[in-house]
Structures are given as C-alpha cells and as structure tokens.
Amino acid sequence: MAFLADALSRVKPSATIAVSQKARELKAKGRDVIGLGAGEPDFDTPDNIKKAAIDAINRGETKYTPVSGIPELRKAIAAKFKRENGLDYSWEQTIVGTGGKQILFNAFMATLNPGDEVSIPAPYWVSYPEMVALCGGTRFFVSATQEHNFKLQAADLEKAITPKTKWFIFNSPSNPTGAAYTHDELKALTDVLMKNPQVWVLTDDMYEHLTYGDFKFVTPVEVEPQLYDRTLTMNGVSKAYAMTGWRIGYAAGPIQLIKAMDMIQGQQTSGATSIAQWAAVEALNGTQDFIPENKKIFEGRRDLVVSMLNQAKGIVCPVPEGAFYVYPSCKGLIGKTAPSGKVIETDEDFVSELLESEGVAVVHGSAFGLGPNFRISYATSEEQLEEACRRIQRFCGACK
C-alpha cells in the first residue's frame, strides 16, 4: 500500500516559490543574486493598518473568530464591493480566508466532482491547475497568446467550453502577464458565458487596484449582471495594501456556495487570524491615499523594465496594463549558445543560464503554461531593476 496519496502524482511544486528559494540559497552561499521571482510588493504595510492590528491585540481580539470571518470585516467587504464595483452583496454572502489561495481551494473543493472540467486561460497563475487537480477536477487549458497581448479571445473560449465545464477562471490584471481586460474585451467573454449557463465564473481580482495610466478596471459581474448568481468574485488585501504576510483573502458570491465553502473551511483552518482580520477592516475602511502613490511608483518601474528589456538582444517585452509583472518573450534566444556553452532550447534553459551566468532570478514561462517567455516581478527597487536589466542585456548579448 502506497503511503502518499495518489493525488500528489497529479500536481507539482510551485515554480515561483522554487525560484525564490533557489535565489535565497545562492545568496546564502555568497552569490550576488537579484531575485525577481517573488510576487509581493516591496512596500511596508501602511501605519494605520499596523496600528489597527496593535489596537486589536490590546483589546484582547486574540480568540477564535467565526469560520467565515468577523462580521466587521465581512460588512467592510460588502461595502467595498458596493463602493468600488457597484455590486450588491449582503455581508452573509461574503467569506474571509487565509489568503486568496484558500478561498480558491475551498471553492473548488466544495464544487468539483470527478470529470468536472475547469477552463483555465494560459498563461495562468501556477496554483490554479494544481488546485483543480488536487480537488479532483479536470484542467482544460486555452491559450491567450502574445499576439493578442495575452488576452483570451471569445472564439477560443467558446471552443474550450464543453458540457462538462463547471468553472471558468478569469484573472485581470493577470499574474503572470500583467494583461488587463477593457470593458469591451471582457464583454466579448461574458457574452460567451451567457450562452453556457452550466459554467460558473471564478474571477481573481487580486490586482484590481494596480492598473496604470487611464485604464479602468472592471470585473465580470459589473459587465454582465446576469452572471451574478454563478460568479464567485475573489479579492484580498495582499497586493494593494502590501499585506502578503497577513494572509487575508476574501470573496463574495451566491449564498449556497459561500455556505459550502464555510463548511470546508470549518474542517480545515476555521477562521483566519483574528488580528489580521482587524487589520483588514482598517485596510478596506480606512484611507486609500497610499494606493495611487504606490501605483505611480510601480508604473515608473514598469516603464523602466519594459524599455530596458526591449533593448536586449532577442527579447520582446509587451507593455502590461496592470499588476507588477512583465512577461517578455525570449524566443529570439532559443537555439543560441549561452556563455557556458550550453544551447538554450527552452525558456527554462534561458532562465537557468541567466541565473548561473548573471545572478538574476526570474521564472520560466512554461511554468505558467505558455512560452518561450519569462516572468519578472518589478516589485523591487528601481536600482535593483536597472542592474538586473543591465545583466539581462549583457547575458543576451553574450549568447551566440
């Protein structure tokens, strides 16, 4: 009898976590490494949010909470959806989890049966397909190519939907590409979904507040209100509020789904950390002034990285609308010989050789389901980004 579960054979470790770990190991050995693999802001959590957590500790808010979250936070979430997205949810239609990952996992665990399909646009966040596999679902990938700025086309979505499709995962702005959908681009997709009433929509809006220029964020139910009864809208405080370590994600959706997710979570972690929940109340209800300030910094970094990467031999880097990632193509380097003498045959080879040669850690695009590309997180200092891009330029120039 095998000791480990068969389900583990269907999943693989997170490539983004692996890259960050490799960078840390090399740094520990004395290597000069610039890590551009981590998907978290380099800003500190705002002081008013930290103070709310300290105040909660001093008030004794250190006990178990309701499984789906404290009422104060769930009411703040409902108010956020009304204020920012024009969506009406009662607080009972919301749920709080230990990060967005738990929200997604609970939704799949509560709904997927063997044979149920989940349509996942590629490139995708590395955890989507692994969660689906762990929960017994079947992954169905549909490519959103660089030709279309990594945005899924309606005709391709239509082809990907079958009678067995239970969920469609939508992520805008995207991790890993930074691509974000306009109202009209999203309307083309929701029109397809309206023709397929068996398909539920799981929208990951974690990067909602990180869009640049005059881009206006929209979420699926805003664009097509008739999807309200079969959409789970997920968000969190990690990215916009620089609270990745606080581990608070949340969602709103149909009450029967929220209750099912509550049941799963009740046998799993129960409520998220009480202190972090009180901090999240302040994040959602308190001042939002730092968000545009941080966005301006991110936008400047984006422009710097895109400009410098497009000067590197063999690299083509589109300009993303949001998040804090770029997803350049390294197709022009495939078949070239790296300074080590190794022939670069895949984007994974490119990333490995770049790390060994120049000490720059990025994530290979094949980990996200579409290559030959690589993902850079520009959530680090401008000085670090400039140096990393110079090293990438040097490495690409040395490939023959």
UniProtKB/Swiss-Prot annotation:
The keyword Transferase applies. It is an enzyme of class 2 (transferase). GO terms for biological process: amino acid metabolic process; biosynthetic process. The record marks 12 as: Important for prephenate aminotransferase activity. It is found in: Cytoplasm. Its cofactor is pyridoxal 5'-phosphate. The modification N6-(pyridoxal phosphate)lysine is found at residue 239. It catalyses: L-aspartate + 2-oxoglutarate = oxaloacetate + L-glutamate; L-arogenate + 2-oxoglutarate = prephenate + L-glutamate. CDD domains: AAT_like. It comes from the Bacteria. Its EC number is 2.6.1.1, 2.6.1.79. It holds the Pfam family Aminotran_1_2. PANTHER family: ASPARTATE AMINOTRANSFERASE. Belongs to the class-I pyridoxal-phosphate-dependent aminotransferase family. Homodimer. This is Probable aspartate/prephenate aminotransferase. It comes from Rhizobium leguminosarum bv. phaseoli.
